[in-house]
């Protein structure tokens, strides 16, 4: 009997001890919260040279955190919510360095370089990989640039701000470059070759994305112009919430629910990409951003005149680096060619993009009206796209004396039955491509009926446009089509920016959602 009681007592003691140990471990774990950083910080990363760089993460509330790189050391304490951040002093070009973050634990990142960092953003033509572009075998074989670093940010659509993402920095090699943005890589490669400094590229593009998905929702709600767009989404969101809570759905309802779930998590819902993608690295030290997007907003081109500048301005304010350079790619030529002049939503979107240069400082546009493919929305020539973007950065940020801006319409005057046009950024003059005859011009009178026009380059660089069918011209358009046939370049090899001299309402003027 005594032996049985002794055995039971021992068993109870063991159970109590185990429970006590588990409680102690749980308590210790609750108190201990390791220092953590989002994956925008990691081995092989590039820090922006010549400016302060923010480093941030989480730890236990009140925990002391020390961040060290080179001869710099910065101390801080985690706030009540566990968040902390420090600002590194400006670093010169160089490396490799070690970045050490020490709290109750220690995190160490190695092979950290200091150079030039650029965001590569937009939709599918920015996301488009080296593997899917022209000559991927040759491009990958040559991609031996140990000081060029890349990181891909995955596509997550949500209304909840994301602190981290699943990705890491990689060194540019023939094995790693294939899955990276082709436009981003060719842009970065040109900077690297021209400047001989480390380059860091952050690719967060999402194919098919709409501009409003990259913008904070409260900013959209603050402007009446976007009320119809937000109301449309509010209706869908309410329908999704109701259907999600319903029971015993039939097959059609299940299909509808799945489709709506895709919309709720997708790349068109306002603020979805801002929260799910951009927020995870917003504030990381950068030089600037390149952008290739607009196809998904072409049906609302007039709205884009305000939406696109709003997005750029909001990014700049939240990044806290002032008006950092923001360069974009104008939409390429695409779709079937038209035999006669016609209205075009793609032309109106290009116009909205060009207008943004007048709205915001430190912006620029790479015109690629000669690079597109009529039957493919994803032209495979990404080398020239990257180079034209690089021209802007090299000339404006790095002081390289090269042509960078496409010729652009400035003014027009009527001279009899002709219109004489003046342009900026022509440089050394004009060069028609392929044939001497200037193609792509259309002219109309006050009746707004456009016909193809003849054009002649004058000695002072102006261009004279006319048609025997229009006795009293009122407007001229150039390359005003989804897929225009046009052939005018500056002698520097940059195509004339598509334009119109009129302000007549276009086909997208009333489209708001």
Range-by-range predicted roles:
Residues 1-11:
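N-terminal secretory signal peptides that target proteins for export/translocation
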Residues 8, 24-26, 101:
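Generic detector of low-complexity/intrinsically disordered segments
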Residues 13-26:
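Bacterial N-terminal signal peptides
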Residues 24-34:
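Bacterial Sec-dependent signal peptides at the C-terminal "C-region" and cleavage site
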Residues 32-513:
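Cell-envelope and extracellular/periplasmic
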């Amino acid at each position: 009997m005594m032996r049985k009681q002794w055995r039971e007592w021992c068993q109870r003691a063991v159970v109590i001890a185990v429970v006590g140990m588990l409680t102690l471990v749980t308590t210790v774990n609750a108190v201990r919260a390791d220092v953590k950083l989002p994956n925008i910080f990691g081995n092989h990363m590039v820090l922006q040279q010549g400016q302060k760089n923010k480093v941030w993460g989480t730890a236990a509330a009140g925990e002391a955190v020390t961040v060290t790189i080179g001869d710099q050391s910065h101390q801080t304490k985690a706030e009540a919510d566990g968040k902390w951040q420090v600002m590194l002093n400006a670093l010169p070009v160089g490396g490799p360095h070690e970045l050490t973050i020490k709290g109750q634990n220690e995190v160490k990142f190695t092979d950290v370089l200091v150079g030039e960092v650029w965001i590569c953003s937009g939709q599918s033509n920015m996301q488009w990989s080296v593997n899917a572009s022209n000559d991927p075998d040759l491009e990958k074989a040559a991609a031996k640039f140990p000081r060029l670093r890349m990181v891909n940010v995955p596509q997550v659509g949500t209304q909840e701000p994301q602190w981290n993402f699943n990705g890491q920095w990689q060194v540019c090699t023939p094995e790693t470059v294939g899955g990276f943005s082709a436009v981003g890589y060719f842009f970065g490669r040109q900077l690297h070759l021209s400047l001989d400094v480390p380059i860091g590229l952050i690719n967060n593009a999402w194919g098919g994305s709409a501009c409003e998905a990259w913008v904070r929702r409260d900013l959209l709600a603050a402007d009446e112009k976007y009320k119809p767009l937000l109301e449309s989404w509010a209706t869908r969101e309410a329908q999704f919430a109701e259907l999600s809570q319903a029971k015993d759905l039939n097959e059609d309802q299940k299909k509808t629910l799945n489709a709506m779930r895709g919309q709720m998590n997708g790349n068109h819902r306002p603020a979805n990409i801002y929260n799910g993608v951009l927020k995870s690295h917003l504030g990381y030290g950068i030089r600037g951003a390149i952008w290739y997007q607009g196809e998904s907003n072409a049906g609302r081109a007039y709205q884009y005149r305000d939406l696109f500048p709003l997005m750029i301005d909001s990014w700049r304010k939240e990044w806290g680096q002032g008006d950092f350079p923001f360069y974009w790619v104008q939409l390429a030529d695409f779709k079937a060619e038209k035999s006669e002049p016609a209205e075009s939503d793609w032309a109106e979107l290009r116009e909205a993009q060009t207008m943004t240069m007048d709205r915001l400082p430190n912006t620029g546009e790479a015109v690629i009206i000669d690079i597109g493919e009529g039957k493919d929305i994803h032209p495979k020539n990404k080398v020239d796209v990257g180079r034209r973007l690089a021209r802007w950065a090299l000339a404006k940020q790095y002081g390289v004396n090269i042509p960078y801006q496409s010729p652009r319409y400035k003014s027009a005057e009527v001279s009899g039955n002709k219109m004489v046009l003046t342009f900026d950024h022509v440089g050394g003059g004009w060069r028609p491509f392929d044939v001497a005859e200037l193609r792509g011009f259309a002219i109309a009178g006050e009746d707004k009926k456009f016909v193809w026009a003849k054009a002649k380059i004058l000695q002072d660089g102006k261009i004279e446009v006319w048609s025997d069918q229009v006795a009293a011209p009122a407007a001229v358009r150039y390359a005003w089509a989804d897929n225009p046939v046009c052939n005018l370049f500056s002698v520097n090899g940059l195509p004339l920016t598509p334009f119109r001299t009129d302000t007549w309402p276009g086909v997208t003027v009333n489209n708001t959602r």
